[in-house]
Amino acid sequence: MRRVAFFLTAIAALLATAQTHYEGQISVGAKGGVSLSRVNFNPSVEQIMLPGMTAGVMFRYIEEKNFGLIAELNMTQRGWKENFEESDYNYSHRFTYLELPIMTHIYFGNRRVKGFFNLGPEINVMLGDGIKSNFAYQDAADMEYFTNDTRHIEQMTMDIKNRFDYGICGGAGMEINLNSKHSLLLEGRFYYGLTDIFPNHKTDIFSSSNSMTVTVTLGYFYRLK
């Protein structure tokens, strides 16, 4: 019991010392970059990653050395692009989301260059969507290419069920401090959605249709405190 009490007292003392000698930091910034996304259909749909854009604003609060929190408000394009292999057909369905990730921020390095990891939950709202195609996808069931193929085509005309999405995101990157106030950062991030975009009841075609997105962004932070 004494050992446990001593251990807890020592930990508390270390935390108090760290907080005493470390000055908290508050930074705001902006970022932009590219996204690559797909929809995890089950049964599977032949597709390739759909490229898009992402941009947003960032808030970072660091209370202890090597540890902090980051919140962002981003606009990101997601969706999927059908893979028709050797055919000239083209179909993609793009979603535009407003994202709010809140992540734990862990960093390491020196004053000039730092590496970091971010991990946390994310909630999203779909603001709009659009389909781009070079054929009458509404009539795909009557087209010879699709009647002779075993691929699913129902997703091309299916109505969206959930415009609210939540999931888990995680990323890693590098930050370069230009001086005491300004810094640049490069980050790669992966998002895995936990909500299905399309209906997923037993009578529906797809049992899952969640989003998966990779983003690569370049950002800028300005330190307020």
Q: Which residues does each PLM region occupy?
A:
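Bacterial Sec-dependent N-terminal signal peptides
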Residues: 1-27, 218-224
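Short glycine/proline- and aromatic-enriched beta-strand/turn motifs that initiate or cap beta-hairpins
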Residues: 19-58, 161, 225
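Gram-negative (and chloroplast) outer-membrane scaffold detector with strong preference
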Residues: 22, 26, 60-141, 178-180, ...
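Residues that define the transmembrane beta-barrel architecture of outer-membrane proteins
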Residues: 24-26, 47-53, 94-100, 113, ...
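Flexible, solvent-exposed coil segments and beta strand-coil junctions
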Residues: 33-40, 79-86, 145-154, 195-200
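Extracellular loop and loop/strand-boundary signature of outer-membrane beta-barrel proteins
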Residues: 40-45, 85-91, 155-160, 202-208
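Short structured motifs
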Residues: 103, 154-157, 171
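Predominantly the C-terminal beta-signal and adjacent terminal strand-loop region
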Residues: 165, 170, 176-225
